[in-house]
Amino acid sequence: MEIIDAKHALADIQENIARFQGTLDLEALTEEIADFENRMTEPGFWDDNTKAQKVIEENNVLKNRRDSFLNLTNQAEEIEVLIDMLAEDPGDVDTATELADSIAQAQKDVEAYNLEQLLTEPYDANNAILEVHPGSGGTESTDWGANLYRMYTRWAQQHGFQVDVLDYHAGDEAGIDSATIKITGHNAFGFLRSEKGVHRFVRISPFDSAGRRHTSFVSVDVMPELDDTIEVEVRDDDIKMDVFRSGGAGGQNVNKVSTGVRLTHEPTGIVVSSTVERTQYGNRDYAMKLLKSKLYQLELEKQEAERAALTGEKMENGWGSQIRSYVLHPYQMVKDHRTNYETNQPQQVLDGDLDPFINAYLQWQLSLKNPN
């Protein structure tokens, strides 16, 4: 890397750091962290375990924000030192390589920090519950459902998030009929709420002996995992419970007893299932948690509708309702119809490279809130 290019890159990194610092009161943040940690050492802190965990989580969020910012400033200082070293010995290949690597990492971390600053909605920091439901399109659609399931799993793993399968139903011939996963990690819901909606797929179907082009649709729903501090009233009389034998994806490790639980909320028609726990009681408890999350989300959507704020609304599976198109034939493209962000590398996207789409969505939402 040429020194002049490195200096330009460093100037850009420092400009971003200065912009971040303008919205960050580091002294106040440090005091808030100290206050949380003092509370954690008080007698009786663990008397209410749920409340204690909430305090710890909030403190971790603040510490993560502080440490991420300080890491950026340290990286900028190290890059400045490397530039000076390379200026003294321009032929030092090792220093040049280290400088290029340090700049690339700092640029990546600046982008990640910037992305986190866009997560301002309630429950953005929460874990995410993500559901995949193939729509019209038959076997082609269920196969695309499996591709989306894999895409989100890959994305989560690349970010160090934990993925738990809550419910999985394999398709008759290929793919999946439906799947529900929990993605555990800081800001998982904030990142993935961009994925809620109908995804459209166009390709030459491997299941069509005539080699014709097919269009399929898959609906994705995303909701935050709510903790017990959120009160949602659910009457026992409104719930119908069914039990079934649960097992792994594709029917592996099927239990000989019915531990899987399916709950139907009759007033709304909402159906949730859980097979993640080992006991029927555990699955009922977790299914109830999912139901409350869905009911809470439903109420939020009603409030948004009343304010005519319908962005992010999940629409009916079918023509014209998609939020994103994945085209593999006659050309290669993935395009988000809300932000107009697109790429001609669909395989990278299907392998989990969703961050550019997530970033574009969050920037788009910010522009809707602040049109000027």
From Swiss-Prot:
Modified residues (N5-methylglutamine): 252
One Gene Ontology term of the molecular function aspect: translation release factor activity, codon specific
Keyword annotations from UniProtKB, A to Z: Cytoplasm, Methylation, Protein biosynthesis
Pfam families in UniProt: PCRF, RF-1
Gene Ontology cellular-component annotations: cytoplasm
UniProt xrefs under InterPro entries: PCRF, Pep_chain_release_fac_I, Pep_chain_release_fac_I_sf, PrfB
Protein modification: Methylated by PrmC. Methylation increases the termination efficiency of RF2.
Cellular localization per UniProt: Cytoplasm
Task performed by this protein: Peptide chain release factor 2 directs the termination of translation in response to the peptide chain termination codons UGA and UAA.
Family matches, as PANTHER family: CLASS I PEPTIDE CHAIN RELEASE FACTOR, PEPTIDE CHAIN RELEASE FACTOR 2
Family, similarity comment: Belongs to the prokaryotic/mitochondrial release factor family.
HAMAP family (UniProt xref): Rel_fac_2
Name of the molecule in the record: Peptide chain release factor 2
Organism: Leuconostoc citreum (strain KM20)
Encoding gene (name): prfB
